[in-house]
């Protein structure tokens, strides 16, 4: 891995780092996650997100390298969609942690899920390993979507909580 490799791995981590630095007091909704018996602890969530962002960055590096590197036209669709989903992923963090808006966060996650699934199909002919590296991301988005949905539902109907 040349110098570009660590850059591709590190860039996805910049968003969460900046968001955490800017958010002085996270939403109280984060504490609500503990009410869900199947929700992982906060440290596990943090570890999984850091791992997924790093793996996602490495996968994008593989695609970039496979298509010849640089900033050429063949990279526009695969890495353009990747950049868009990365921005959506960072937006989810803002909506969920800072804006205290589980409904918008859920909508963001649904769009993100579709984009990541599209990336798997687009990246598969380019680099199979890169596409496979996105599958744990899809699995984690499923868990995150379930948690966010539950928090959104409970915020709409607080008396319906089991």
UniProtKB/Swiss-Prot annotation:
GO terms for molecular function: 5-aminolevulinic acid transmembrane transporter activity; cholesterol binding. Coiled coil: none annotated. It is found in: Endoplasmic reticulum membrane; Cell membrane. The chain crosses the membrane at residues 3-23, 44-64, 79-99, 103-123, 129-149. InterPro entries: TspO/MBR-related_sf, TspO_MBR. GO terms for cellular component: endoplasmic reticulum; endoplasmic reticulum membrane; plasma membrane. It is a multi-pass membrane protein. Keywords: Cell membrane, Endoplasmic reticulum, Membrane, Receptor, Transmembrane, Transmembrane helix, Transport. Pfam families: TspO_MBR. Disruption phenotype: Decreases erythrocyte count and increases reticulocyte count. Abnormal erythroblast cytokinesis and differentiation. Decreases hemoglobin levels in maturing erythroid cells. One of its GO terms (biological process) is lipid droplet organization. The keyword Transport applies. Expressed in liver, bone marrow and spleen. In spleen, detected in red pulp but not in white pulp. The keyword Cell membrane applies. Belongs to the TspO/BZRP family. Cholesterol-binding protein involved in the redistribution of cholesterol from lipid droplets to the endoplasmic reticulum. Required to meet cholesterol demands during erythropoietic differentiation. May play a role in transport processes at the plasma membrane of erythrocytes, including regulating VDAC-mediated ATP export, and import of the heme precursors protoporphyrin IX and 5-aminolevulinic acid. The C-terminal region mediates cholesterol-binding. Homotetramer. May also form homodimer. This is Translocator protein 2. It comes from Mus musculus (Mouse). The lineage of its organism: Eukaryota, Metazoa, Chordata, Craniata, Vertebrata. The gene is Tspo2.
């Amino acid at each position: 891995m040349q110098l570009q490799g660590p850059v591709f791995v590190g860039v996805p981590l910049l968003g969460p780092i900046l968001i955490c630095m800017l958010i002085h007091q996270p939403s109280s909704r984060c504490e609500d996650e503990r009410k869900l018996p199947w929700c992982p602890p906060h440290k596990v969530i943090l570890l999984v997100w850091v791992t997924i962002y790093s793996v996602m960055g490495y996968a994008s590096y593989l695609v970039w390298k496979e298509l010849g590197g640089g900033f050429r036209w063949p990279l526009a669709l695969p890495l353009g969609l990747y950049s868009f989903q990365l921005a959506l992923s960072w937006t989810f963090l803002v909506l969920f942690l800072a804006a205290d808006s589980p409904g918008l966060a859920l909508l963001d996650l649904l769009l993100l899920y579709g984009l990541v699934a599209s990336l798997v199909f687009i990246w598969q002919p380019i680099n199979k390993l890169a596409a496979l590296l996105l599958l744990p991301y899809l699995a984690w988005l499923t868990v995150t979507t379930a948690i966010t949905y539950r928090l959104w539902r409970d915020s709409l109907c607080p008396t319906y909580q089991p």
